[in-house]
Amino acid sequence: MIFKIEDVTVYFPYDNIYPEQYEYMVELKRALDAKGHCLLEMPTGTGKTIALLSLITSYRLSRPDSPIKLVYCTRTVHEMEKTLGELKLLHDYQVRHLGTQAKILALGLSSRKNLCVNTKVLAAENRDSVDAACRKRTASWVRALSTENPNVELCDFFENYEKAAENALLPPGVYTLEDLRAFGKNRGWCPYFLARHMIQFANVIVYSYQYLLDPKVAGFISKELQKESVVVFDEAHNIDNVCIEALSVSVRRVTLEGANRNLNKIRQEIDRFKATDAGRLRAEYNRLVEGLALRGDLSGGDQWLANPALPHDILKEAVPGNIRRAEHFVHVLRRLLQYLGVRLDTENVEKESPVSFVSSLNSQAGIEQKTLKFCYDRLQSLMLTLEITDTDEFLPIQTVCDFATLVGTYARGFSIIIEPYDERMPHIPDPILQLSCHDASLAIKPVFDRFQSVVITSGTLSPIDLYPRLLNFTPVVSRSFKMSMTRDCICPMVLTRGSDQLPVSTKFDMRSDPGVVRNYGKLLVEMVSIVPDGVVCFFVSYSYMDGIIATWNETGILKEIMQQKLVFIETQDVVETTLALDNYRRACDCGRGAVFFSVARGKVAEGIDFDRHYGRLVVMYGVPFQYTLSKILRARLEYLHDTFQIKEGDFLTFDALRQAAQCVGRVIRSKADYGMMIFADKRYSRHDKRSKLPGWILSHLRDAHLNLSTDMAIHIAREFLRKMAQPYDKAGTMGRKTLLTQEDLEKMAETGVQDMAY
């Protein structure tokens, strides 16, 4: 359908549109017109992605004089592929109606591991090894050496791409990762470097958050992006955590041991170069004296991760004299490693500010703050000079230089925390030194400052007023949408007690109570006997899940569950979990039914959909608070209170409830779908807790469903399933119109009414 929103003609590839999609587009257009940033919470399963893509691409077509670029950030490769699939459909529709003027270039960008087509490189076991294997075949010095020694192995795809030079271009179209690989194989060009090259010409780019938020990656991937770009962070409920992780570094004993080995190897290489090619080291020294850290623009194969500090915090001056000579720099790093080793050798938890840490480092190891700031750039320069390609082997020394650069650059918003062991396993010595960032606004500020509009959107952004405070920005539009429905296809319930009327909760003093564990088990036994197909259970942590499953196994509860449905469990091993998910789906497909045990904040809670028969019921056991005794969390809470006046309890509740909402939202992925949500903890019945759930869940949470026992929940579930068994009328009856036609939109435009009756 084609319709107008004010002066923009919107091309939408479906015959009908949901009222909330239309409203979403109206609010998004307001933000684009104002050239400002916005926060939009849209219920899951209501076509948020296609609404966003339709409006922004149509907005671009309506402003041919000032075309905008869309940068769409997703959390996972699966979401990236899904977004590009939707964009393909939309692009075909627009080209059908507008011809060649609607043609765009859109592509996804991911790591070498996901884009490489060289089978020998792909044989490496992990992402870092794939990067190193690629570098061994594409570095400029390796390619130069191959002219003298034909036995040196190069990458044919990269060589062909380099030979094509300016002609290595992608024709207009929408390219998924699979399309890029196929195109690369067909032309004999490297898809990874081709995609990197095409970013500057593309109208739409879809990639991971890190490509914009992590300075190390953004520094060489996204630095050329124009200001007239609209940046979208999809599924952005955890964006503050992504920002914090981008600027945090952890150092363990194993890191220091690896870094020492790296320095030994670097020292050997320096000695070898002194004997065979001393001029190269001299040239590097002269370059550093002149203040040129790197040799101009590096070719693709030579590029390294950028500086870990944010662009405006990097010093634009010459490297300090005491680390210009390679051997002097190695000596400084040795002293730094010795100092870190001494600090890790402690029996007490220590917490201090970067200023205090740098002062102590200066007095005990003689390393100044300015020297620390340049550690990462100096290491990068040295490794290029020494022509080192085994980048995966040198990760430990890179981590230490990351740490040094960040601790030397930032005085506020960070803490250094040294813990001799994990508090949850105090009998195992495992010292860790963490430079922890507490201020999410630091990493995202360059994005807000640089780009015209930033859209933060998700199904879970409640309470929506907390995000501007956490990220320190002022949105021009901030809106939470409700879900229009022809039938009440979601049924949230709060279970506060078992059939024996004992209260249930995962509060620390109650979670191990045999009565609570028994009631949680009995709830599931009763539910699996009446709910068809798939049931998903989320626990607050891996340790709690392991403990409760072990108890259920001993008491025979697990056996009772398995008489009704097969049981699959998420583990911390990605391969095991993927296999368990695959078998869970097969059990649901063949009618046997299955239960999947998972963990809030785990991989499954964040990125796997349990739509249709894969998830007819989700049980959230407990309130998924973070581990509140964590020293890093305590330091962050202190910082948030002092800087943004966010109370400790408010933040902890907000964080726990967004995770709970994310877990239960996994079961509804469209309006034709249906599912039940059970919040099994007495704390959810308190207004201060449940009020922080998204509006689209709260609007279906009736007062009669707030303080249930197991037998009451069973009765409600039976009634709900009976209702859902009736034929589904997707057009809407009884005045609850949830699909708008083109005529409806035209009428609304005439009357000026934008809010339809839900």
Curated annotation (Swiss-Prot):
GO MF annotations for this entry? 4 iron, 4 sulfur cluster binding; ATP binding; ATP hydrolysis activity; DNA binding; DNA helicase activity; metal ion binding
Chain residues that bind [4Fe-4S] cluster: 116, 134, 155, 190
- Which SMART domains does UniProt cross-reference here? DEXDc2 (SM00488), HELICc2 (SM00491)
Q: Which cofactor does it need?
A: [4Fe-4S] cluster
The answer on whether this UniProt entry bears the keyword DNA repair reads yes
Respond yes or no to whether keyword Transmembrane is given for this record.
Answer: no
Which PROSITE patterns does the annotation name?
DEAH_ATP_HELICASE, HELICASE_ATP_BIND_2
What's noted on cofactor binding? Answer: Binds 1 [4Fe-4S] cluster.
Q: List the disulfide bonds.
A: none
Where is ATP annotated to bind? 42-49
Instruction: Give the record's family classification.
Output: Belongs to the helicase family. RAD3/XPD subfamily.
Q: How does it assemble?
A: Component of the 7-subunit TFIIH core complex composed of XPB, XPD, TFB1/GTF2H1, GTF2H2/P44, TFB4/GTF2H3, TFB2/GTF2H4 and TFB5/GTF2H5, which is active in NER. The core complex associates with the 3-subunit CDK-activating kinase (CAK) module composed of CYCH1/cyclin H1, CDKD and MAT1/At4g30820 to form the 10-subunit holoenzyme (holo-TFIIH) active in transcription. Interacts with GTF2H2/p44.
What is the protein named? General transcription and DNA repair factor IIH helicase subunit XPD
Please give the organism: Arabidopsis thaliana
